[in-house]
Amino acid sequence: MTLDFPRSFRTLFLIGLAALLAACQSVPPTTGFTAAQIAALQSQGFVENGSGWMLNMPERLLFPSNESDVSPDQQQRISDIAAKLVSVGIVTARVEGHTDSTGTSAYNLALSQARAQAVAGPMQAGGMRFTADQIVGRGETVPLSSNATAEGRQDNRRVVVIVTPQ
């Protein structure tokens, strides 16, 4: 016994089968980075967030109150990270300095800019390039934690490095 399906059912079946097979294809990532660049970012401690890849060092880039100096060990680590990124074609980033709410807004803005510069320097030594608008002080405007506690203020005294596709 042979079933005779009308031509429209066969056509519909073939279209459905083609759509099902197309859905099984692997789609390359649309992040704007190559697989080698993503591997380098991950190996250096970057994590993907909504605005790019953010450096997430275990000791983080935290600062004592009213300080903008980076220790020699951190300078070397930052320079090494930059050199690794440059080796896979990532040659720039955004460096954002932040403060707690202690002090005036003007003082905190200047301090956060100095912190961003202190991190950008070793990155430049590692081969990265920056324009003036990529090294930014945010002052106290983007806190991670409440400034009501000493721990919260410590969390907010930081520098964030963000890498996005060129």
Task: List the predicted regions and their residue ranges.
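Bacterial N-terminal signal peptides that target proteins for export
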Residues: 2-13
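Envelope-exposed proteins and targeting segments
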Residues: 51-53, 57-59, 66, 89-91, ...
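Bacterial signal peptide processing site
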Residues: 25-28
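Periplasmic OmpA-like peptidoglycan-binding domain that tethers envelope proteins to the cell wall
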Residues: 98-166
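Short, small-residue-rich loop/turn micro-motifs
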Residues: 57-61, 89, 97-99, 137-139
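C-terminal motif of bacterial Sec signal peptides marking the signal peptidase cleavage site
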Residues: 19-23
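N-terminal secretory signal peptides
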Residues: 30-56
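Periplasmic peptidoglycan-binding/anchoring modules of Gram-negative envelope and division proteins
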Residues: 39-42, 47-48, 62-96, 124-125, ...
